[in-house]
Amino acid sequence: MKVLVLGAGVAGVSSAWYLAEAGHEVTVIDRAKGVAMETSFANAGQLSYGYTTPWAAPGIPTKALKWLFKSHPPLLFRPDGSLYQIEWLWRMLQNCTAAHYQTNKERMVRISEYSREMFRRFEAQTGMNFEERKKGTLQIFRQTKEVEAAEQDIAVLERYGVPYRRLKPEECAEFEPALARVTAKIAGGLHLPADATGDCHLFTENLYKLCQEKGVQFHFNQTISRIDHNGLRIKAVETETGRFEADAVVCALGCFSRTVLAQLDLDLPIYPVKGYSLTLPVTNSDGAPVSTVLDESYKVAITRFDNRIRVGGMAELSGYEIKLPEKRRETLALVVNDLFPEGGDLSQALFWSGLRPMTPDSTPLIGRTRFENLFLNTGHGTLGWTMSLGSAKLTADIVSGKDTEIRSDDLSLSRYQA
């Protein structure tokens, strides 16, 4: 079967890989000049299978109001002039109940744990290098109330058999020795030993090469202008420079999935949530993180690659703009300098921003649409890297008409149309 994948980020390229593995003739198109040039370019680097948590959570509305008055808020709202922004926020608020949180968390953990297994199989098959470190995630809490609030997440971890360990402040240095210098700033910690880190952009570039070896065709600098369909069947996707016919189409366009598929009267509840990152060279390995440290207070992750530190996080609801305000840079610099003051050189840091495709319930959209040959693999929010291989394998199995290895019926767009 000829399958066309829209989007060459980590979701699209991973989908292409598994579709090619299944024997399909695969073509990928993207508006950028290469793979992983947008959301996948400089994300936080976490493969946080255990730390898979919905943004829509009990208490978030109250926290969001308090954050408005902080000098370095983890969440920032800027009106973008659209009614849709308000509608999306309202949908998200409706998911901030304890019942919805548990349902959404379970879906997310299910995908993430499956993705962990897919990474295990993939690495055994390919031996790919993407600066991966399998040394876990350390979530640190600066306040006692944050430690107490984490018990809700721990209950879900136990339900899914995800290994974890509660830590006293001084125990955090067992996993991140450099934190011994700042123990007084920590109220407690949670260690997830099965998590990992890795460079998403490097991974996608290497996977792109493997896909090419399997015969996958890539066409870059292709901006989609029209989707040609006959009733509920997609015939072709037209760009400014070509026409791509296919038996099946997979949409993995991240935040732009909504705008592109709007012409088909498909209402994808995706909003672009802007995030930021700094990438700085390691100057003192003893003073740098070993793996990923997640600062719960600032919602910022500090991740170690081979010779670099990636500091990423925050959430800004401001539409599709990707400006780089100095205030956001200051927040990232503050957090890494506060916890790892001797680890890297901030004067050489590269500042970046990207748009995460977030759904109101934080769960991605995977599977069928009302169009018989149009499939989705999008809306992963902050967890596109973590969920990449799991989501892609689910998508490939659904496109191929195979039974999926885990439950997937509650991941499709239909959950918003009931």
Swiss-Prot record:
Keywords: FAD, Flavoprotein, Oxidoreductase. Pathway: Amino-acid degradation; D-alanine degradation; NH(3) and pyruvate from D-alanine: step 1/1. Pfam families: DAO (PF01266). It catalyses: a D-alpha-amino acid + A + H2O = a 2-oxocarboxylate + AH2 + NH4(+). Its EC number is 1.4.99.-. Its cofactor is FAD. FAD binds at residues 3-17. The keyword Oxidoreductase applies. GO terms for molecular function: D-amino-acid dehydrogenase activity. SUPFAM superfamilies: FAD-linked reductases, C-terminal domain (SSF54373), FAD/NAD(P)-binding domain (SSF51905). GO terms for biological process: D-alanine catabolic process. The keyword Cell cycle does not apply. It is an enzyme of class 1 (oxidoreductase). GO terms for cellular component: cytoplasm; plasma membrane. Belongs to the DadA oxidoreductase family. NCBIfam families: PRK00711.1. Oxidative deamination of D-amino acids. This is D-amino acid dehydrogenase. It comes from Neisseria meningitidis serogroup C / serotype 2a (strain ATCC 700532 / DSM 15464 / FAM18).
